[in-house]
Design a protein with these regions (language model features):
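Periplasmic-binding protein-like
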Residues: 73-97
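Solvent-exposed, acidic/flexible segments
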Residues: 2-7, 60-67, 117-121
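Ligand-binding pocket segment of bilobal, Venus flytrap-like solute-binding proteins
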Residues: 1-44
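A bilobed periplasmic-binding-protein/Venus flytrap-type ligand-binding module shared by bacterial periplasmic
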Residues: 52-63, 82-83
Length: 133
């Protein structure tokens, strides 16, 4: 089953529509566990993908100083220490993982070849559509 968002994956589990799901964002499962749902995350022994959420200042931004201030705020102790309470891994190694989740250093991460993905993007999209439509 293909759905349109990470949250929809978690919802199919909490409603009992599915017993298992493959998902790229543990945050929603973590929040559901916090609410008492019996959802378990399995970290594959052969590796999991880490999907970053970058904060950047775009070249030519109309207010670069404000953008830099926001970027600095996003990596500050104040913000980074809020993330685990929402089931999100912080981007800094000095911040504990979400409660009950292993530290990132204990999760085998799969390397992602972004250049190859970019080269193969059209073929990958075509193949995806062939399989799932």
């Amino acid at each position: 089953m293909i759905v349109q968002s990470h949250q929809q994956v978690a919802e199919t589990l909490t409603r009992g529509e599915r017993l298992i799901a493959a998902e790229g964002a543990d945050q929603f499962a973590w929040l559901d566990r916090k609410e008492g749902h019996k959802i378990q995350t399995i970290w594959p022994a052969d590796g999991a993908f880490a999907i970053g959420a970058p904060t950047v200042v775009i070249k030519g931004a109309p207010h670069p100083n404000a953008a830099k201030a926001l970027a600095e705020f996003m990596i500050s102790d104040t913000v980074q220490k809020l993330l685990p309470g929402e089931g999100i891994y912080a981007g800094r190694s000095d911040v504990e993982p979400p409660a009950g989740n292993p530290p990132l250093g204990q999760i085998k991460l799969m390397p992602i070849d972004y250049e190859q993905i970019e080269k193969d993007a059209k073929m990958l999209k075509t193949r995806f559509n062939e399989i799932y439509q």
